[in-house]
Amino acid sequence: MKFMTSDEIREAYLSFFEKKGHKRLPSASLIPDDPQLMFTVAGMVPFKPIFWGKVDPVYPRVTTCQKCVRTNDIENVGRTPRHHTFFEMLGNFSFGDYFKQEAIEWAWEFVTKVLEMPEEKLWVSVYEYDDEAYEIWRKLGVPERKIVRMSKEDNFWGPAGPTGPCGPCSEIFYDTGVEVPVPEGQDPTPANTDGRYIEIWNLVFTEFYQDEEGNLHPLPRKNIDTGAGLERISAMMQGVYWNFDTDLFKPIIESIENVLKVSYKSDKVKDVSIRVIADHVRSVTFMIADGVLPSNEGRGYVLRRVLRRALRHGVLLGAKEPFLYKIVDSVVQKMGKIYPEIVEKQSFVENIVKSEELKFINNLSRGLEIVQKIVTTSGKISAEDAFKLYDTYGFPIDILRDIATENGYELDEKGFEKYLEEQRERSRKAQGEVEFAQKTGYENLGIETVFVGYDTLVSESSVLKIRVNGEFVEKAEGNDLECELILDITPFYAEKGGQVADTGVIKSQDGLFTVEYVYSPVEGIIVHRGKLNGKISVNEKVQSQVDEIKRKSTMRNHTATHILHSALRKVLGSHVRQAGSLVEPTRLRFDFTHYQALTKDEITKIENIVNEVILKAIPVVTEIKSYDEAVKEGAMALFEEKYGDFVRVVKVSDFSEELCGGTHVKNTGEIGLFKIVSESAVSAGVRRIEAITGLNSLEYLRTDEELFEKLKLLLEAPKSEIVEKIQKILEEKKNLEKEIQEIKRKLINPEEIAKKVKEYNNIKYVVSVLEDVEPDILKDLIDNISDRIKGIVLLISKMSDKIIVTVKVPKELTQDYNAGNIAKLVSKVLGGGGGGSPTFAQAGGKLIEKIDEATELFEKIIRKEVQ
């Protein structure tokens, strides 16, 4: 077999299909014109509207070499011969022009005549029910033993997203001859081995469209969509097993060797890192050139993940400063002639990469140290730890997955995703509000606010800065004028560490400023946001007054949170760690690591312990200590917090000791009463407790007492008999409902419903709308009616708060009609959903006004007017 470079293969492919009447088109952008896709993941993506029949093709035949990005198997990149995040897909496409015969014949011709691959090295696969494709391959001379029938999982392609064109496919494999395990008593084939037979070309016979519910619909025209991986073909044509050993990667790997002073193929572990960098730098280069920029959402986050994963592997190879931007040039030199956009954008790409590396490399080193401490302590990476590493140090989950895989650690990815979604939700809410809290304008002001709120709720201060509509002014005047003040001294606590900000008032000589929110945009500055009525000026003396009731309620809840944390560890075990908290005047919310829901007994024990500490009226002591000293003494530090050399320690005798900058009561007795109001799951391995203290607890108990009093009057029973009385009423209700349903069952006459039978093309069917019939009765009823008419039945039951749809299709009619699909379509009209088997299905809905429309749709389905 002759040797061919990747450039020669690419050109040979495109030229071959040009000669077959195909229009050669340039690669489309990696950013698809498709809201369902993050990136262009296959050669056919730019042509999806044509395959759908939504757009008429300009050319009936097209050939391309499409740049693609996929990151779904990113953890395998560098560890296997053929996984990549960026790759080039050669493709030839037919839009209602030729179909299977030509597609198969031309593919075989190109592989055997142009590439001159030995026929004895080639195998093919077909979809198990595609006899047409099987016969075409056989007539081309492929031995029957080398034509492998494979399942839908292997040989039915698409769609490239939740919806889109799809169809059966046929693949061409190259036999590398590599020794691999084979099932006992079987000869090796592409179906029963892994790693020996390399798929080099996939021919997709696109003839269906898959909708959002997974249903297949015939396309207006049959199409051909093929994909041949340039990297894989290059490996075969260059006589190597690993794609990374082809000329597509060699120049990039050489650049990595030079920049990082390492040698490829000298150390298996280092080789993985070199291959990861070689792959990822291609993705990064092309993504940025196509307009993707690093961010924390969408495509930008995918780019950031890939870039940071490459950076992590560089650090493993000894990199201590940015290096990836230096390797971009090797990608441009290798691929710039084919993709001129990366030549034009080279400088821009390098600057973006370097900037991103500078942001992350210091955090990476610190984060890796923390990961090591975590796994040394627990032997696993919890969802909480994973999220904190992501949130604090920018660690993508891929990096943690790599670390876990390399070292055999457990990683809670599902829990991490839950944390991430919660953060996104908070972010979405915050974006809808007016953003005063931007750092812009507060850096380098050369001023500082002294917080005195630990000791007093009132202070005399001077106004240092006034900000209105984002601009600093010398004075402000108005009614309900939104503005921000910075004081030299303040008793107002700025939101931090889970504790909400104080509220209150700031009084000037001629004005009153109502404090609604307090925050610290940069270290040392506290900003008061609120509304001004009257006048206020810079350098004016003002009186600050924190809302005492709210502050003291918050203090009670904050100290109670610390006590709760320790109580949880005593009752549940030392594995309990804080995973998040919120301290407000009205309640506290505490998230913690634990593997299961708390029992009623555990909740009672926790409440009792907390209340015992409260009743003992233990002094709450705060001290300033060095971080090392505090941790050495056993003070609990929170992973997400960034601590300085000296920290504030809040101690409740020997019961609780934590690093905390929040406000607390002087004595646990001030908390009054502690009551847990809910316990729930946040994510895998993380639970949440919500609780109240002080007067809020008393009000909670008073509300319960009032409820009991009402129940006593309604049930005419003493408090001790209320539960028994309710149980008796519920049992009576249940029995009455059974009696009602039995009466309904007897009143409904299946024979009368069966008389409504209609017929279309020898298919008998009945549709009937009933009132308040339960699902189990509907099932018996529909079986009876279907047996009577030997046909299809749709029953719709209007309940008080919902609609029940039941469909029955005789087995002999399921080739043309599917009960599950009918139920889905009908219930969708009714604003619901559901499904079932081809013979029986039930679904639900809620739009009673749409019942007529639903029955009309059913009749259209019977008449084949709707698929």
From Swiss-Prot:
From the Swiss-Prot or TrEMBL record, state where the protein is found. Cytoplasm
Q: Supply the alphabetized keyword list.
A: Aminoacyl-tRNA synthetase, ATP-binding, Cytoplasm, Ligase, Metal-binding, Nucleotide-binding, Protein biosynthesis, RNA-binding, tRNA-binding, Zinc
One annotated GO biological process: alanyl-tRNA aminoacylation
User: EC?
Assistant: 6.1.1.7
- Where is this chain primarily localised? cytoplasm
User: What is its cofactor?
Assistant: Zn(2+)
Q: How is the cofactor bound?
A: Binds 1 zinc ion per subunit.
Residues the entry annotates as binding Zn(2+): 558, 562, 660, 664
Any GO MF annotation of the entry: zinc ion binding
Q: What InterPro entries does the database record attribute to this sequence?
A: aa-tRNA-synth_II/BPL/LPL (IPR045864), Ala-tRNA-lgiase_IIc (IPR002318), Ala-tRNA-ligase_IIc_anticod-bd (IPR018162), Ala-tRNA-synth_IIc_core (IPR018165), Ala-tRNA-synth_IIc_N (IPR018164), Ala-tRNA_ligase (IPR050058), Ala_tRNA_ligase_euk/bac (IPR023033), DHHA1_dom (IPR003156)
- Keyword flag Translocase: no
What reaction is this protein's catalytic activity?
Answer: tRNA(Ala) + L-alanine + ATP = L-alanyl-tRNA(Ala) + AMP + diphosphate
Query: Taxonomically, which superkingdom?
Result: Bacteria
Q: Which Pfam families match?
A: DHHA1 (PF02272), tRNA-synt_2c (PF01411), tRNA_SAD (PF07973)
Cellular compartments per GO CC? cytosol
Keyword Zinc attributed? yes
Gene3D superfamilies per UniProt: 2.40.30.130, 3.10.310.40, 3.30.54.20, 6.10.250.550, Bira Bifunctional Protein, Domain 2, Threonyl-trna Synthetase, Chain A, domain 2
| Domain-level remarks | Consists of three domains; the N-terminal catalytic domain, the editing domain and the C-terminal C-Ala domain. The editing domain removes incorrectly charged amino acids, while the C-Ala domain, along with tRNA(Ala), serves as a bridge to cooperatively bring together the editing and aminoacylation centers thus stimulating deacylation of misacylated tRNAs.
Family from the record = Belongs to the class-II aminoacyl-tRNA synthetase family.
Q: What does this protein do?
A: Catalyzes the attachment of alanine to tRNA(Ala) in a two-step reaction: alanine is first activated by ATP to form Ala-AMP and then transferred to the acceptor end of tRNA(Ala). Also edits incorrectly charged Ser-tRNA(Ala) and Gly-tRNA(Ala) via its editing domain.
Stated name of the protein? Alanine--tRNA ligase
**What gene is this protein a product of?**
alaS
